[in-house]
Regions:
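Ribokinase/PfkB-type carbohydrate-kinase core domain
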Residues: 2-20, 80-94, 107-239
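C-terminal catalytic lobe of FAD-dependent flavoproteins
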Residues: 103
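Conserved phosphate-binding/catalytic region of the ribokinase-like
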Residues: 1-6, 16-20, 173-174, 205-302
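Glycine-rich phosphate/adenosyl-contacting loop at the front of the ribokinase-like
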Residues: 1-65, 77
Length: 302
C-alpha cells in the first residue's frame, strides 16, 4: 500500500474555454434559441477539483495521489498524462463511459457561465479505489455513486487518523447530507454563498464562522469575492484582503486557494501565513485561462 502526504478525491474533467462578445442583459447571456453564438479564443485544459488540487499539492513538494474516475477516451488519456507529468499517482479508475466535460463561456470583465457534463466522474464505486494511506485527504465535490464512495472512505480514514480537508460546492451542500463529513473535517473551505447555504440548511444561527464551526470543522475559511477572506480556528478570527488584480478567468481559482491554504497547514504554517499562501496561489490562477498552468512551483514540504 502506497503512503502519501495528501490524496485528493473529486472530479477530473476536460475544460473547454471560449470567449464571447454576446451582450448581457439582466445578468444573463442574451441569445435567441436557434441562433449561432460566435466564440473566440477556444482553449482546452484539464480541470476538476481533484486534478486541480493534486497539481497544486504536488508542485508544493508533497507526495500526492488523486482519486477520480475518468472515461476510456482521449480526454481520459490527457488526464492520465497530466497526472504523470505532475508526479501524481492515479488511485481512481477508468470506466467504460466518457470523461466529464465542462464548457466555460467567458465574457470579458463580466464573468462566466459553465456547462458541465460529469459523466464517469460521478460513477466511482469504493471498490474501484486503489488502496492507499495518507496523512491528509482533500475532498472536492462529487455526486452519485462517487459521493457515496467518497463519504465511506473519508469516514473510515478519519477514524484511522487521516486529517480531512473539505471544499464542498453549492450543489453538493444543496443535494446531500454532509454533516457526518463535517464532524471529522480538520479544514473546511467555502465561499460566502456556500457558507450561508450550509448554515441555513442545518438551521445554524449567529455569526457564520462560529455557527459553521459548531458543525464540527476545526478550522473554517470563508472567501467572499473581492471582500476580505476570513478564517476561524475556535480561538481567534483572521482576515486577509484580496489584491486588486486584473481577473482574466475564474475557473480553478477556488481550488487553487483551498489547496494553497491546506498546503500551508500541512507545512505547519501559522494561519496568517496559510492565508497569504492561499491568496497568492488563487490569484496566480485568476490572471490566466486554465485552472492550473500558473500554479506556484515551490517546495514547502517540511
Amino acid at each position: 500500500v502506497k503512503n502519501f502526504d495528501v490524496v485528493t478525491f473529486g472530479s477530473a474533467i476536460a475544460d473547454i474555454f471560449g470567449t464571447t462578445d454576446q451582450p448581457i442583459t439582466n445578468n444573463s447571456f442574451n441569445y435567441k434559441i436557434g441562433h449561432k453564438l460566435l466564440i473566440k479564443n477556444l482553449q482546452f485544459d484539464i480541470g476538476g477539483g481533484a486534478t486541480n488540487a493534486a497539481t497544486a499539492f504536488s508542485r508544493f513538494g508533497f507526495k500526492t495521489g488523486c482519486v477520480c474516475k475518468i472515461g476510456d477516451d482521449n480526454n481520459g488519456k490527457d488526464i492520465l498524462a497530466l497526472l504523470k507529468k505532475e508526479k501524481i499517482s492515479f488511485l481512481g479508475s477508468i470506466g467504460k463511459g466518457k470523461t466529464g466535460v465542462s464548457i466555460i463561456l467567458n465574457k470579458k470583465k463580466v464573468g462566466r457561465t459553465v456547462l458541465t457534463n460529469r459523466e464517469e466522474s460521478d460513477n466511482l464505486k469504493s471498490s474501484e479505489v486503489k488502496p492507499f494511506k495518507t496523512k491528509w485527504l482533500y475532498l472536492s465535490s462529487l455526486l452519485g455513486e462517487s459521493f457515496i464512495a467518497q463519504k465511506k472512505i473519508a469516514l473510515k480514514m478519519a477514524k484511522q487518523g487521516t486529517k480531512i480537508a473539505f471544499n464542498p460546492s453549492e450543489y453538493l451542500i444543496k443535494s446531500k447530507d454532509i454533516r457526518e463529513i463535517l464532524k471529522v473535517t480538520s479544514v473546511l473551505i467555502l465561499n460566502e454563498e456556500e457558507a450561508r447555504l450550509l448554515a441555513k440548511k442545518y438551521k445554524k444561527k449567529g455569526p457564520l464562522l462560529h455557527s459553521i464551526r459548531s458543525l464540527g470543522p476545526k478550522i473554517i475559511v470563508i472567501t467572499n469575492s473581492n471582500y476580505p477572506i476570513r478564517a476561524y480556528n475556535g480561538i481567534r478570527e483572521y482576515s486577509i484582503k484580496p489584491h486588486k488584480i486584473k481577473v482574466i478567468e475564474r475557473t480553478g481559482a477556488g481550488d487553487a486557494f483551498a489547496s494553497g491554504f491546506v498546503a500551508g497547514i500541512m507545512a505547519n504554517y501559522q494561519i496568517e501565513k496559510c492565508l497569504k499562501l492561499a491568496l497568492k496561489e488563487g490569484e496566480s490562477v485568476l490572471k490566466y485561462f486554465g485552472a492550473k498552468n500558473k500554479l506556484l512551483k515551490k517546495n514547502i514540504r517540511q
